[in-house]
């Protein structure tokens, strides 16, 4: 529970408002639509922290061109990756970090990676949904 409280404090220091919290499962959700964060789920699962945000639903989960583009996008990300959910229908941003040594800058870097990716690839994501 200590690490969960530290993560919440870091989010506060970074200026994020916790939209939802499940203290029992050590999960928080933050949103800042002005910078591309929309229901970013932050889950403290000892020994790691998982950051995950829904990006889009694929029109065709077997579209090799879209899947190839997602892999190429991953190469440019500083932290995290675009991944598919269990059904292969939804694209998510996902990153994992070690909780034991987590510091403010590391958490900020992961969130910033999502923000940069959303800005850089917004046009591609819109194209994937057409």
Which stretches of residues belong to each language-model region?
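Extended Gly/Ser/Thr-rich low-complexity repeat segments
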Residues: 42-47, 106-112
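Charge-rich, low-complexity N-terminal segments
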Residues: 1-37, 76, 83-84
């Amino acid at each position: 529970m200590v690490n969960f409280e530290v993560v919440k404090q870091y989010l506060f220091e970074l200026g994020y408002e916790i939209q939802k919290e499940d203290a029992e499962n050590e999960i928080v959700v933050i949103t800042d639509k002005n910078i591309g964060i929309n229901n970013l789920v932050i889950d403290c699962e000892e020994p790691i922290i998982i950051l995950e945000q829904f990006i889009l639903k694929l029109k065709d989960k077997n579209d090799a061109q879209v899947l190839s583009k997602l892999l190429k996008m991953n190469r440019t990300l500083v932290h995290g990756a675009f991944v598919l959910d269990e059904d292969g229908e939804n694209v998510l941003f996902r990153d994992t970090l070690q909780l034991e040594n987590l510091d403010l800058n590391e958490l900020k870097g992961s969130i910033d990676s999502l923000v940069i990716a959303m800005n850089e690839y917004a046009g591609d994501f819109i194209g994937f949904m057409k």
